């Protein structure tokens, strides 16, 4: 951007002021009148140096002020001086002033601070010029020949006069003009310096303007960026608000989840505390039971020692009594004869394959002949067996009666035989005993069966071969054959059933039923129970007379009612008249224990699901007894009531039950 050009005030009056200064104005109207001056009569001279314009353009305002202040003092001398100057010279000077006026209108207005300083310098210079001009004008009356030379830089160029008059004036004018020229030249130099400073200042202003333009463009860019940032800020604030709402919702959700977790933790802690207290109580009870058990063991040892002492005392007293009798010797001999077979030594036959062959025959006979008792028992449900089967059964029973004593004696040889052969041998004994159930009881077999049961329960312990010579008096280690206490499950299961068939001692039977309950907890035990048709064996003990064993018997049957693949075959095996007859007799017993009644009701409830058993329930009037028990049962016994209701519902007697209860009310 170029700096603005401003005309200084009063620029049109510069020429008039110069006229008034040199006496060409209104002070000398009679002598010189330049108002109607014809400019075409004079040659206009141009400035030869570009610095001429700078002299007059440097300080226009300051010069005009100076002239206005001092025109009063120097008007008269200058008028007298210029009266002597030729008119042509004045015309040339006037033309120069007109050119100066035109050039001054094209100059630029300089900064105010530079004007003031330049004005002061110009005033001082003109004061010096006036001091020099005053004495000169008073003494000299000759006109000037020249104003200035053509080669100078002064603003007024002088014109040479005719040679006749120039020689007279050359002694006075050059010295004064040269002084004015020197002063003006000094002013010109100062003005050049000021012009250079002003140009430099203008360049600085241009640089500053360019800098401001750049700053303005940068400001515009910043404004655009700020507007964009404002839009982005609004979007960011919106998204931030959305994220804040999502965060608040998530925090609220997590707070709710944390509260639920805290509640669950509190519940778990309370449950854990309850379990811990229960565990501590059980530990305390266990410690008390252990202490009591230890005391009971000590007491049992003492009782056993006392019993041994009493037995020895009884034997001693018996011997003392027998000494006084006449047949004491005979009794002693009989006792020795009874003890002799026990201490007798046995020799194992050399051919062991005979036992293997016998066991094969025993398996064959047991599986294909003796186990047919199942079909005969199934014919007991109101159907008489055929005659040919009856004759065959009698023959089998007679043969079994003959074989059982021999097989009981052979048990003494079992320790010397391979343990793999024990199972077929015991299986043959079991099925032989089962054949005797169908026929009449033989009184001659009582002692044999008791001995057989004791040997199976206790096992057989025999001594090895013993030589009578003194050098071979050392006996071999004793050999045992365990049946009831065997680790083999099939052999132990068969031995348990044989003990239940033959033994009458309550402690042996209790141990046998405990072992049977443990074996029935496994699937293999349940399979063996069905394979060996053990339901009739259990039913023989399901009677009210044996109250001590009744709970164990019911537990054995209850183990078979657990949900498994053996449940349905077991229920079919119990769906016969013998089982329902036994249950009917048991239910008729007065003051039957509540636990036994609950267990029995569970078995009957499962049997009632089979539709064909409804006839057996009605045949033995079990449904009526169940209705009576339901009517008299305390409602607090919820388990028993549920089983009875379910059984009656399966039999289709629920409505009848409601009618009976309403009639009783």
From Swiss-Prot:
One of the Pfam families matching this protein, by short name: CCDC138_C
Cysteines joined through disulfide linkages: none
Record's keyword annotation contains Coiled coil: yes
Sites bearing Phosphoserine, chain numbering: 49, 469
**What does the UniProt keyword field contain?**
Coiled coil, Phosphoprotein
Q: Which residues form a coiled coil?
A: 198-323
InterPro entries per the UniProt record, alphabetical: CCDC138, CCDC138_C, CCDC138_cc
Superkingdom, taxonomy of origin = Eukaryota
Q: Which residues carry this modification: Phosphothreonine?
A: 48
Quick check: keyword Coiled coil in the entry? yes
What is the recorded name of this protein?
Coiled-coil domain-containing protein 138
Its lineage reads: Eukaryota, Metazoa, Chordata, Craniata, Vertebrata
